[in-house]
């Protein structure tokens, strides 16, 4: 059987660039090489695309704090539409190896916000993960919360700040509505980039300024007292949920360094030590949230479980990490689906959805 060529797109012009490199390394290592050939498509921090050498594409590959994309002499351009060669050498216009399906693992801005997905749709390339709308909606925490709330799902109370209204809403008003502590977040960032915990007006001002360094819109959330539970969802029209896992923190909250740099910052417990009926309740809510946002392929749904066993949805991540400590693959391993089989299934789901999309009528 002829192997499929899988283009793994990674890196990106994002605050989560290094996280993406870690995820790509693990996917390359785990992919079923008897079924798939890998084409590495690395994006540097300036947004330039490169074809990378699979044997030597990372610097400091085993050091999360210093991992980097190795410079490549071959930069590429993409040719939209149905062509024999979708990728060409940007320097000389010569065709580059074709790909059958794209596995995007570009976390954060321009990677999981619908931008990359839109480009791949225009190129008529199958790709792993959610489509444009779901990707954009889940990336924007303000939009996510509004859609979940309208669907009757439980979310933390919040206020949205923009550059236009931020000075019209005082700290006293925010505290009166949401109480303390607060969490201040850029609306369109992941991996806790630019997130602060706030317990005073002085901290609030600093936190809002920091969040606006990363986005034009900022979310201020009520702090929820509860356990941090995560659930993995997999599928297109009939998604399935994994068993649940828990993030047990040794720090104040799940910050970027806690997730990816400090090995002692948090403990990942899979499966979570919760009652079976609570596990099933969270799994059902995760699937409902996934379908509400129109997700496909995969997503990780993060919730808080309060002492009263109330489930409060925190966020939905449509391109969850595949790093050594990432919860998404661990949850499926605990549910009986190994790392290699998970990657294979994600590729299959991408091809299935692409075939269904191409079967739709485009003319009257």
From Swiss-Prot:
Pathway: Cell wall biogenesis; peptidoglycan biosynthesis. ATP binds at residues 175-230. Its EC number is 6.3.2.4. One of its GO terms (biological process) is peptidoglycan biosynthetic process. Mg(2+) 2 binds at residues 315, 317. PROSITE patterns: ATP_GRASP, DALA_DALA_LIGASE_1, DALA_DALA_LIGASE_2. This is D-alanine--D-alanine ligase A. It is an enzyme of class 6 (ligase). It is found in: Cytoplasm. Its cofactor is Mg(2+); Mn(2+). The keyword Cell cycle does not apply. Its main location: cytoplasm. InterPro entries: ATP-grasp (IPR011761), ATP_grasp_subdomain_1 (IPR013815), D-Ala_lig_Van_CS (IPR000291), D_ala_D_ala (IPR005905), Dala_Dala_lig_C (IPR011095), Dala_Dala_lig_N (IPR011127), PreATP-grasp_dom_sf (IPR016185). GO terms for molecular function: ATP binding; D-alanine-D-alanine ligase activity; metal ion binding. Binds 2 magnesium or manganese ions per subunit. GO terms for cellular component: cytosol. Mg(2+) 1 binds at residues 302, 315. Residues 145-348 form the ATP-grasp domain. Cell wall formation. The keyword Cytoplasm applies.
């Amino acid at each position: 059987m002829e192997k499929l060529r899988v283009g793994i797109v990674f890196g990106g012009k994002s605050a989560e660039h290094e996280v993406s490199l870690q995820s790509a390394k693990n996917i390359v290592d785990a992919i079923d090489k008897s079924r798939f050939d890998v084409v590495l498509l690395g994006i540097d921090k300036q947004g330039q695309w490169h074809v990378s050498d699979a044997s030597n594409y990372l610097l400091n590959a085993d050091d999360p704090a210093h991992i980097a994309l190795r410079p490549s002499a071959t930069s590429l351009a993409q040719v939209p539409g149905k062509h024999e060669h979708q990728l060409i050498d940007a320097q000389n216009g010569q065709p580059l190896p074709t790909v059958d399906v794209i596995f995007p693992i570009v976390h954060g801005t321009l990677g999981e916000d619908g931008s990359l997905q839109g480009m791949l749709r225009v190129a008529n390339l199958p790709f792993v993960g959610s489509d444009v709308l779901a990707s954009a909606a889940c990336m924007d925490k303000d939009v996510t919360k509004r859609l979940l709330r309208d669907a009757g799902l439980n979310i933390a109370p919040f206020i949205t700040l923009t550059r236009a209204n931020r000075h019209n809403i005082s700290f006293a008003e925010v505290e009166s509505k949401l109480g303390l502590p607060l969490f201040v977040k850029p609306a369109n960032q992941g991996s806790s980039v630019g997130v602060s915990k706030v317990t005073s007006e002085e901290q609030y001002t600093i936190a809002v300024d920091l969040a606006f360094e990363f986005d034009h819109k900022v979310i201020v959330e009520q702090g929820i007292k509860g356990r941090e539970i995560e659930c993995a969802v997999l599928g297109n029209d009939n998604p399935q949920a994994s068993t649940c896992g828990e993030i047990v923190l040794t720090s104040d909250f799940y910050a970027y360094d806690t997730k990816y740099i400090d090995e002692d910052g948090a403990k990942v417990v899979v499966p979570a030590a919760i009652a079976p009926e609570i596990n099933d309740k969270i799994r059902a809510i995760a699937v409902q949230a996934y379908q509400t946002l129109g997700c496909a392929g995969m997503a990780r749904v993060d919730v808080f479980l309060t002492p009263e066993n109330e489930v409060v949805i925190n966020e939905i991540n449509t391109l969850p990490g595949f790093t050594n400590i990432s919860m998404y693959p661990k949850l499926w391993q605990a549910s009986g689906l190994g790392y290699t089989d998970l990657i294979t299934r994600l590729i299959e789901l991408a091809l299935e959805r692409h075939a269904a999309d191409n079967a739709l009528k485009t003319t009257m």
